[in-house]
Amino acid sequence: MEQYQVTGMSCAACSARVEKAVSSVEGVTSCSVSLLTNSMGVEGTADSSVIIKAVEDAGYGAKKKGVQTQSNSSDADLLKDRETPVLKKRLITSLCFLIPLMYLSMGHMMWNWPIPKILDGNHVAMGLIQLLFTTIIMVINQKFFISGFKSLFHKAPNMDTLVALGSAASYGYSVYILFAMTDAQMHQNMDAVMKYMHEFYFESAAMILTLITVGKMLEARSKGKTTDALKSLMKLAPKTAVVIHNEQEIEVGIEQVHQGDIFVVKPGENIPVDGIIIKGNSALNESALTGESIPVDKKEGDAVSAATLNTSGYLKCEATRVGEDTTLSQIIQMVSDAAATKAPIAKVADKVSGIFVPTVICIAIATMIIWLLVGQSFGFALARGISVLVISCPCALGLATPVAIMVGNGMGAKHGIMFKTAVSLEETGKTQIIALDKTGTITSGKPQVTDMVPVEGISEEELLSIAYALEKKSEHPLAHAILQKAEEAQIHDNLEIKNFLAVAGNGLSGKIDKETVYGGNQRFIEKYAKIPLSMIKKSEELANQGKTPLFFACDEQLIGIIAVADVIKEDSPQAVKELQNMGIRVVMLTGDNERTAKAIGKQAGVDHVIAGVLPEGKESVIRDLKEKGKVAMVGDGINDAPALTRADMGIAIGAGTDIAIDAADVVLMKSRLSDVPAAIRLSRATLKNIHENLFWAFIYNIIGIPLAAGAWYMLLGWKLNPMFGAAAMSLSSFCVVTNALRLNLFKMHDASKDQKIKNSVVLEEIQVQNITKQEEKTMKKTMKIEGMMCGHCEAAVKKALESLEGVEEAIVSHEEGTAVVSMTNEVSDDVLTQTVEDKDYKVTEIE
């Protein structure tokens, strides 16, 4: 998407006009204009010069934005609130002339305030003074007239057109009255003079401009606050870096740093670009990027990101990503792109904004004609028409959605939750089913030692020492868990392994002095050592908890079991509970076998588990789930891309510095599952805010325009002075923007106010295991089986056993050589044995 800066827009009608003009350019596939940031996002093959010309032909200005990181500062300058100081200056100057004008025009009539003697009784002079003050105020606020009439001539009237027409009509009619009064004065017709004196609308013309300026200033200040998050991100970009050239440290501009350059960072300095530490260690404060305030320890080989703060050590790093490729630049681009897109809910407001101003002008003209036809004076009819013009506000409609999107997106970015588009921010909260990938999402993705069970006579330290000596020569992921546990226990044993042998998928063996040691699964160890029944039961207990039991033996004697598991993240159960409290069905996807999957699922508290799903099979599962309701898929983005893309909403968790995950609609920079319900809360709060804004914008115009037209005058005697209409218009947009700013106070991690949406989704037809029901089992038997070699063997034995009447479930493991059979009715050992052996496997024992 190419980004453009657009100038000259003042209201929603302007942005609608620009969007329509650019969308009609050949080669443009999509165009989205943001009145809030005065920016435009364009997709397609059209040349930028053609796009800029289309904008200029529509009566506005445009220029293409730069994309380099060094432009972050200039982009921040583009977002700087330059409008408020200008409007403030105009307002103060206008008030200097408006106050005496109001004193002269209304003070003596309404409150009997004294007027200067030179003007007392001199009605023509009084009119001329009002004419002078009003003319000065109109010159001060000439922007309304230049923009308004220019847009009118381009056949694209906007809010400024309404203001300009209303003020100009008041001014023109008052000038006519002044001439008529002068003529009456010359003919000594004092009754006519007094009548004309009360028909001046100079104060209305001036007050309309001043009040609209007040509203514009309040709106500009509020709009400036909505982009604070984006501006603060842009200002984080470091301006310089210290690089090493010819063994000397040289400070250079950030744009001069290239990939592969070596740079240094001292304590208290920010990392200039993304890189890898090649020397030194430190703790980095990454709160600017992830929202996590606790410093993260970094050592040689670890990645560092631009804009993070080096709190302690001296670091020497190699630049890996510079310019627009840094994490910070990608975040800025993502927030900017989201601001440039439009949520589906904005389409109604956009359609209304496109025809709003012409419709209002027609209503104003019709109002005047109707009042003249029913016999009212021209002055009365004109006042009603002017009131219609100045009370109508297309800006409130146009700002209702983008201000909420900008604030919501900024809030998310502060907490490491990145919504790529306005659509993703709106739609995430509508999720009915959440599919969670197990590894890296519910669990940490890093196996850890959870239990150590030494046999009698062996200490935990002795067991861990032998396991450490054996496993340190292995490359298996489970071996790393044992090595980490040994390091934590400060075991630095000098036991040396000789004749090391690794049997793929089974275990390890080697010699320590004259003793042979073994480590591996139950089936492997049984070949070399007798395993007591108590230890077999313990291993089954551990397996039922979702853990992998590793057996260790020394010279035909079992010395113990070490259980390893990919442990559940600390916040996962609470996050799942929060999702369920929101009325969302939570499904876990995993490639694990049923027993392990169900154990993890129970710990996490999910509604359903789908086990045995390979990475390539996740996409088809998501397709099935989508038939039941709106699905969000949460994964780490590494092997989940097809599933993330297939889901209604793809959420990549734990992205860290790699936020450019194309398949994801929402990117969570931290690995906390609790950020998923937080993202849904923020989405729901933003959508609610948009609904409030749209309601206010529509109801304001629906009530205000008939009131201004005098619809209630004949019945209740209500009529609206144009000045009060202008005051209402000036406050309408301010109210909308201020309401959106309330999102800054929203606590997205607070679950106390969660509302449970009505969810009629039923998942029974999908091949899932419902783990929330208490399973009633009258008997359980464990069969030891030889001959099973793979998953197909497991499936064959499982299918055979579960075909028996009375067998409710059979959990089969070829690695452990066991089948745990759950029965609701008694099934004899002979029947179980015969059933398995008919499949060419051997049953050695049943317990």
What are these regions (language model features)?
Residues 87-89, 308, 432-436, 442-475, ...:
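ATP-driven catalytic headpiece of P-type ATPases
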Residues 16, 29, 267, 431, ...:
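Conserved ATP-binding TGD loop and adjacent catalytic N/P-domain core of P-type ATPases
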Residues 181, 190-192, 206-267, 298, ...:
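Juxtamembrane coupling segments of multi-pass membrane pumps/enzymes
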Residues 25-49, 53, 199-200, 231-325, ...:
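Conserved cytosolic catalytic loops of P-type ATPases
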Residues 289, 348, 383, 396-470, ...:
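Conserved catalytic phosphorylation-site environment of P-type ATPases
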